[in-house]
Amino acid sequence: MMLHIPGVLTNAQVAQCRELLDAADWVDGNATSGAQSALAKRNRQLPEGSPVARAVGDAIQDALARHALFFSAALPLKVFPPLFNRYAGGETFGTHVDNAIRLLRGTDFRVRSDLSATLFLAEPDAYDGGELCVEDTYGVHRAKLPAGDLVLYPASSLHHVTPVTRGERVASFFWIQSMVRDDGDRTLLFQLDTQIQALSAEKGAKDPMVISLTGIYHNLLRKWADA
């Protein structure tokens, strides 16, 4: 499931993040690449351990923790600290698949990459190109979202970023280990939760059907979750 999650950051928060990011020192994006990605990746990136990356990453994680739609869709168990990249002057990232396990350098913190996320930090009209293209059995899905919005998709997906031919594309990217590892199971839970919320808004939280469906949701989560 590929999902657009709007409003993770406000316009003011995006501006604060960009002020810090634009003043930071960036390095070749292959600093974090696997063997396959290094052949396809042409961009710049903040070093993982930089104070700016940590500060902006913490702000993003705080925002994610408050975002109900993100939690419902991802059911996060662990979130890899957000990383940051930028593309300009024809820079691109060819077709690749993300590594299954991400290790935070200098620590024993590991994340199984069930989900990949890109949080856009530049407005779509600020650059040409730079679309995130995610492939699945139904074709290629493209994302170029407003600043502050996030796209979430299975980390097992082949994906690429088209060349940026004007302006600059700035984004954060990171991976999530979900409590529910299977994408199909996780999608069913998200769909069920969405319907429960809609029914609750219509009939009230004390409605017998809402209570029954909520019980089914939690029993399925209990069956499938690792916590």
Curated annotation (Swiss-Prot):
2-oxoglutarate binds at residue 169. Its cofactor is Fe(2+); L-ascorbate. Pfam families: 2OG-FeII_Oxy_3, PKHD_C. Fe cation binds at residues 96, 98, 159. Residues 78-178 form the Fe2OG dioxygenase domain. GO terms for molecular function: 2-oxoglutarate-dependent dioxygenase activity; iron ion binding; L-ascorbic acid binding. It comes from the Bacteria. The keyword Kinase does not apply. Keywords: Dioxygenase, Iron, Metal-binding, Oxidoreductase, Vitamin C. InterPro entries: Oxoglu/Fe-dep_dioxygenase_dom, PKHD_C, PKHD_hydroxylase, Pro_4_hyd_alph, Pro_4_hyd_alph_FE2OG_OXY. Disulfide bonds: none annotated. Binds 1 Fe(2+) ion per subunit. GO terms for biological process: DNA damage response; intracellular iron ion homeostasis. The keyword Transmembrane does not apply. Its EC number is 1.14.11.-. HAMAP family: Hydroxyl_YbiX. This is PKHD-type hydroxylase BamMC406_4714.
